[in-house]
């Protein structure tokens, strides 16, 4: 059985395999029909226990463009509201002949639990504060497309590192390619032991200076159970990407953000519109990357053996 549960245990070779295939899938997206029969006859189900626009829509379009039969389950109107357990939901989907389940959950490890208790493929679309593997893969795809490489780069990740599954997946993925990773954010939002995996900068200016890529993160207020920041205004003043901080950033430095963006909090509208901003590209590339992942997870050789 083949799954994509995270980048921590994914090999460098498998990441390259996904990115290479995503390049081919992007060619299909540029065609007039945007259609391929690779998943014809397959049943792909999305099950999101958390809100999503980009990831859910991107996966659904990816499956449709590959001719899969797609079903989207709304947790709010499903039997979950009647007290159905996660395991029973999984067994129901199994009985309905699901081939691939794309799942997002607020609890870390849920995709791994499902993968151990089902016969279909499982793709992690974000689990708690753990990982968001396809977001990191599309970030890496965008970097490689823009810069020609994902190796030996200087990368800054700015913002709510503590609660960010995007940050974790990017650190796991990018660190496999001999990149120098620096993180910066409010001290309350920097996780313990992060020094084992990345350098912690002492200022925003230090963090972004001389970098090839700056990845800005969303403040995840929905995961914060106490006051990690004093106010959005203060956050923007000290940690936001604006015109003032751009003085320390090269015109060739990629400005990235996984979305959704809080304009005027994490990043200004003006910075988002710069030529070196890749925010819209990341959304487009997400479809190609997810097409590649769906293809590999439904093939015998797959991502995992």
From Swiss-Prot:
PROSITE patterns, per database record: CARBAMOYLTRANSFERASE
GO biological process: 'de novo' pyrimidine nucleobase biosynthetic process; 'de novo' UMP biosynthetic process; amino acid metabolic process
Annotated coiled-coil segments of the chain: none
Residues that hold L-aspartate according to the record: 82, 165, 218
Binding site for carbamoyl phosphate: 54-55, 104, 132, 135, 259-260
GO molecular function: amino acid binding; aspartate carbamoyltransferase activity
Keywords: Pyrimidine biosynthesis, Transferase
GO cellular component: cytosol
Keyword RNA-binding: no
Pfam families on file: OTCace (PF00185), OTCace_N (PF02729)
Transmembrane regions listed in the UniProt entry: none
Keyword Ribosomal protein: no
EC number(s) reported in the record: 2.1.3.2
Function: Catalyzes the condensation of carbamoyl phosphate and aspartate to form carbamoyl aspartate and inorganic phosphate, the committed step in the de novo pyrimidine nucleotide biosynthesis pathway.
Quaternary structure, from the entry: Heterododecamer (2C3:3R2) of six catalytic PyrB chains organized as two trimers (C3), and six regulatory PyrI chains organized as three dimers (R2).
NCBIfam families (UniProt xref): asp_carb_tr, PRK00856.1
Protein family per UniProt: Belongs to the aspartate/ornithine carbamoyltransferase superfamily. ATCase family.
Protein name: Aspartate carbamoyltransferase catalytic subunit
Organism: Caldicellulosiruptor saccharolyticus (strain ATCC 43494 / DSM 8903 / Tp8T 6331)
